[in-house]
């Protein structure tokens, strides 16, 4: 009765107005699952490939009709009739049918939509929430959010080189309280920026995108906003950065054009070390470029005992790249983006590999999102303790926070908010 009976795909829009793939999987029992895939702006060179049509007459070449046709054609032919609960077998079949090392033939967007929709259908067939279906009875940790309240880099049209400035409400007792704390600080930040004459338009991930001159200025505004909202930076709330350093790494140089600074790897490490000394920064993502393994080792040796160093473009949710990084002693955490690797099984393997090595895992959205809230369930299912899903505005971001609040209510007294347990040192 849990056999896959039908798969329907369609082209929908993401939060940037670009096409993406949505899939409905229906089982013989009548149970259904639906999933829509996200898309990134700053993408790692080693990510699985999302398939775009390239037809300039539609969506500027960004259409996904080829991916849709693969879902309803080759993919359905390959997995139709299979038991939806056999997730690993289904994902292995998808990988085999694609036949490429980076999922470039069928497209990671087509494969992931099917993989996630299948898991949701199986959960619905069993009558349990997705987080419980995937994580079992031990899925009970509500993650600390990394809330991106100031956007820069590729996520905004402003001079700030660093892509994301985030807050983490580590002292909140529950996820619902954490969301409230974040929303109050976000509102206070809007007032502070406006009073200083800055615009309060928001970027791709819902954070403000003011024309600030430096990372230090952005962090100073966030510090003031926390205090105005009644919270203590470093005690109630900690800070996190996503540098997306690959985006400003040119010809062996880290070129912070907005600040007028250029560094080699050692200089970039000193720059980040200085910021972490001035502000309560407890997590830095992609502080160095995706293939600068030597620089990453220096960063890890310098800051790794007290700061969480997250590999996003460095690891691209790929268990093999993660294992390589672990062997070299680089970074101490992985950012988990389901569309970077293209199947649910490989995503879960990446989290498991990280945890076995003592690395933290942070479940993450992409800058081009939809109303799909699957990553909220995945964060709880894996007990990863942290989630990165944007600011406190734009419904594509708040959908994930709202789902976490629902999960917390569902867990009742068995749920626990990760809080300060995520901190190093």
Curated annotation (Swiss-Prot):
EC code: 4.2.1.11
Chief location: cytoplasm
Keywords assigned by UniProt, alphabetized: Cytoplasm, Glycolysis, Lyase, Magnesium, Metal-binding, Secreted
GO molecular function terms listed in the Swiss-Prot or TrEMBL record: magnesium ion binding; phosphopyruvate hydratase activity
Cofactor binding description: Binds a second Mg(2+) ion via substrate during catalysis.
Record: active site: 205, 337
Enzyme class per UniProt: lyase
Pathway: Carbohydrate degradation; glycolysis; pyruvate from D-glyceraldehyde 3-phosphate: step 4/5
Gene Ontology, cellular component aspect: cell surface; extracellular region; phosphopyruvate hydratase complex
Pfam families: Enolase_C, Enolase_N
CDD domains with a match to the protein in the record: enolase
GO process terms (BP): glycolytic process
Family per similarity comment: Belongs to the enolase family.
Stated role: Catalyzes the reversible conversion of 2-phosphoglycerate (2-PG) into phosphoenolpyruvate (PEP). It is essential for the degradation of carbohydrates via glycolysis.
Protein name: Enolase
Species: Granulibacter bethesdensis (strain ATCC BAA-1260 / CGDNIH1)
